Regions:
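C-terminal capping/extension of enzyme domains
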Residues: 1-17, 38-39, 82-97, 123-172
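Short amphipathic alpha-helices and their capping/turn segments at secondary-structure boundaries
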Residues: 6-13, 56-65, 99
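A residue-level structural signature of the nucleotidyltransferase/glycosyltransferase Rossmann-like core
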Residues: 18, 35, 107-108
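N-terminal nucleotide-binding beta1-loop-alpha1 segment
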Residues: 20-23
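Short, glycine/serine-rich, charged loops/turns that create anion-binding
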Residues: 25, 115, 148
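Short, surface-exposed acidic-centric catalytic microdomains
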Residues: 28-88
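Short glycine-/acidic-enriched loop or helix-start segments at secondary-structure transitions
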Residues: 29-32, 118-121, 153-154
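Internal catalytic-core helix/loop-beta-alpha segment
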Residues: 67-124
Length: 172
């Protein structure tokens, strides 16, 4: 099966209040065509419990979040699987940067330290969770613990709550 079949559609438009960025679609997400679709993934519960969304959405409802000012993309639009299974050549940081410059979201949230490490070009161990130092004209950037069930040892909701508080403090 071609990796291009695994692509999830970007959910982007100008001036979103928040864009969630993953490394690549999980195998399950790629099969279903929905972000964070694996039953063990905590994403949908986390964004609700943290106060980012007014209710708990289901993976198949991801497109509805654009009406809340929330978008989605991945650094690899053609790879699928767990982070360690994603081929390096499918990671497109320049393409991601171009999308963010085009759409100018207010806040970017990487949904794992691995994703942030690929963006920043530094080891995951060197990246702290939470709000990152401001980088010039770039939007605010948060790094969240991976909601994947495979990353349960490092799970905490606190950075997600920090993100929710930040978003609410900047509401129009």
């Amino acid at each position: 099966m071609s990796n291009t079949l695994h692509r999830l559609p970007d959910q982007l438009r100008p001036n979103l209040r928040l864009v969630f960025v993953g490394t690549a679609a999980s195998t399950r997400s790629a099969e279903l065509g929905h972000y964070y679709a694996h039953p063990g993934n905590r994403f949908w519960r986390a964004i609700h419990e943290a106060g980012i969304t007014p209710r708990r959405y289901q993976p198949g409802e991801f497109a509805a979040l654009i009406e809340l000012g929330i978008g989605f993309t991945d650094l690899s639009k053609t790879g699928a699987g767990m982070d360690h299974q994603i081929a390096a050549e499918t990671i497109d940081v320049p393409g991601f940067r171009a999308k963010m410059e085009k759409y100018r979201p207010r806040t970017i949230a990487f949904t794992s330290k691995k994703t942030a490490s690929l963006f920043y070009g530094m080891p995951s161990a060197a990246i702290a969770l939470g709000r990152q130092a401001r980088d010039g004209s770039w939007p605010e950037i948060f790094v969240l613990p991976s909601p994947s069930g495979a990353a349960s040892g490092s799970w905490t909701l606190e950075p997600w709550r920090e993100l929710a508080a930040w978003i609410k403090s900047r509401a129009d």
